[in-house]
Swiss-Prot record:
<feature type="compositionally biased region" description="Polar residues">
    <location>
        <begin position="137"/>
        <end position="151"/>
    </location>
</feature>
<feature type="region of interest" description="Disordered">
    <location>
        <begin position="83"/>
        <end position="111"/>
    </location>
</feature>
<dbReference type="GO" id="GO:0030686">
    <property type="term" value="C:90S preribosome"/>
</dbReference>
<feature type="modified residue" description="Phosphoserine">
    <location>
        <position position="308"/>
    </location>
</feature>
<feature type="region of interest" description="Disordered">
    <location>
        <begin position="409"/>
        <end position="494"/>
    </location>
</feature>
<feature type="modified residue" description="Phosphoserine">
    <location>
        <position position="94"/>
    </location>
</feature>
<feature type="modified residue" description="Phosphoserine">
    <location>
        <position position="175"/>
    </location>
</feature>
<feature type="region of interest" description="Disordered">
    <location>
        <begin position="125"/>
        <end position="197"/>
    </location>
</feature>
<feature type="modified residue" description="Phosphoserine">
    <location>
        <position position="170"/>
    </location>
</feature>
<feature type="compositionally biased region" description="Basic residues">
    <location>
        <begin position="684"/>
        <end position="705"/>
    </location>
</feature>
<feature type="region of interest" description="Disordered">
    <location>
        <begin position="248"/>
        <end position="283"/>
    </location>
</feature>
<feature type="modified residue" description="Phosphoserine">
    <location>
        <position position="93"/>
    </location>
</feature>
<feature type="region of interest" description="Disordered">
    <location>
        <begin position="592"/>
        <end position="705"/>
    </location>
</feature>
<feature type="modified residue" description="Phosphoserine">
    <location>
        <position position="162"/>
    </location>
</feature>
<feature type="modified residue" description="Phosphoserine">
    <location>
        <position position="630"/>
    </location>
</feature>
<feature type="compositionally biased region" description="Basic residues">
    <location>
        <begin position="648"/>
        <end position="658"/>
    </location>
</feature>
<dbReference type="GO" id="GO:0000447">
    <property type="term" value="P:endonucleolytic cleavage in ITS1 to separate SSU-rRNA from 5.8S rRNA and LSU-rRNA from tricistronic rRNA transcript (SSU-rRNA, 5.8S rRNA, LSU-rRNA)"/>
</dbReference>
Amino acid sequence: MPEPRGSSPLRVNAAFAARYGRYREREELQRLKDRYGDRHSSSDSSSESDSSDEHVEFDPQQERDFYRTLSLLKKKDPRIYQKDATFYQRTASSSDSEEEPAAEKRKKVQPMYLKDYERKVILEKGGKYVDEENSDGETSNQRLQQSSSKSYVEEQKQLKESFRAFVEDSEDEDSAEEGGSGLLQKRAKSKEEKAQEDADYIEWLKGQKEIQNPDTLKELTHLREFWNNPELDEGERFLRDYILNKRYEEEGEEEDEEEEDEEEERVPGPPVQLAVDDSSDEGELFLKKQEDFELKYNFRFEEPDSASVKTYPRSIASSVRRKDERRKEKREETRERKKREKARKQEELKQLKNLKRKEILAKLERLRQVTGNETLGFEEQDLEGDFDPARHDQLMQKCFGDEYYGAMEEEKPQFEEEEGLEDDWNWDTWAGPEQGGAWSQQEPHCEDPDFNMDADYDPSQPRKKQREAPSLGKKKRKSPFATAVGQEKPVFDPGDKTFEEYLDEYYRLDYEDIIDDLPCRFKYRTVVPCDFGLSTEEILAADDKELNRWCSLKKTCMYRSEQEELQDKRVYSQKARNVWKKQQIFKSLCPEEAEMPTEATGKPQRDRAGSSGQLVAPDGACGKRSQPESTPAEEEADPVTPTEKLAPQRRKRGKKARLLGPTVTLGGREFSRQRLQAFGLNPKRLHFRQLGRQRRKQQGPKSSH
């Protein structure tokens, strides 16, 4: 009977039907478990049904036996043709023993409820609940009674026997296998260690890793070389990847993914309502999926994630926004351009310095040729180093000093008499070869006897030497002096630079850095030499503190103008004339004063001839001694100038002058306090010391009576 036109064929989802069938079976199984309890038989049947869904796990030893057998097959070993050859060495007992713990792992751990605990108490303890603390107390009391009943020797003997029994039990291999407590037992490897060994084994077969102990894998070496051969065909390569990478486990996952994709690709329609028990976990999961599907279908036209505020990172990696780095690129370009210009400027200055050095060396060569001095003081290595002002001045003084410009021969040169030299020739009036005296400075005249009528003649060109007519007699030979005088001399050019100016220009090309196309160099300036009124010996022998009192280090290193330096030089030269003041400051340079301390120090004085214990006058010099009085005859012989006569008179007037204020007596002379303070002494201290000495002198005679 034909189908009506408006009817559509009924489609059934086979995957969904299969899953629903499995779900119904599990639901029925759970209902039976709740009614009759969990039996071993039911657990075995459930484990068998679940094992079909789980992935098959191979034993590692079986995998190694499989790889060893495959290696022998690829190698075509003769053992594969033997009838009694065994390739899988595992026994049934070992397989059963290893399957038992695996089955135990698959079993679920059953929780202990209150009913189970009460049943256990009734069966084991007769329905009596005993606290753990009381039981421990009872056992401790029993142990105490037992230990108290035995002596010390008996206890030691009992301990030794128990230890001996324990050692014998550990040495017995049979007892250890039966469950005895062995002393040393082989440590069982953990799951992580076994998994790491299997992974290393697979990596070794792939050729990606080396194993430290390859002796146990000798039979698999051929299989490893065969699989790592670069000329391996496509089929063998697929088999290698399928086995080593366990592609067979991925097939089940791919099937599940395909089923899910088919469900998503279905035409959306009203969901199929199924009767599901809400108490089951899978039923709840199914209902949740149903609600999610209805929610997505009802709100499919709304904006997704409307309840959440979206935020975006500032820098998006996948953005197509163009970065504007023109300013950065411009700065880098400017920096590179300035660097290139600086390098080019340095190269130009280097070339200019080389040209200047060649010019100076050429001038040195000319000087050697003209002066005849091959060992001139300047060499090429003097121009290679950095500029040193002291070295430069030393070389200039050595090469072009007074000895160079003002050197005169001490003795008149003597030449051997040669034949053909006329004695009556006056060489002092000789003006050089081919020179006509004052007429050479003027232009030639047509009436001159030596006027050249040739139109191509150029008078500016040097004249050729006139050849003397060959004489029939003996040939005349010139003397060395005549040869030296007859050489052509370089004409002095007032516009030419001196050698010192050439060197200054050469060293001026040195620079520290280039800033804005301008070579920056440290400028040296010529300063006025100033010794601050001290000689070299005084500066080296004096103490640092004394030098600082004479002139501070800050003042010596100060940057001053030339006028200020001249003023300081003049002031310190006048200060150095005061020998007494220099003596007071530089006491380390006057050993005589150290031997005879003054009364200001409070120490006993030594009598010195000619001084009579008096303080050295300001006019006295350091280290000078008083001269002995001259005899009347010497006084008459030496005429005395008027200034020398006035000097003693001035001293006498100074003694007769009235001293204002309190005075201090030193060495039989009176000095005012202002005078002593000008000498750098403390007048109050000297005054009180003087009073103390006077008081001691007065008390001395009284104590003697």
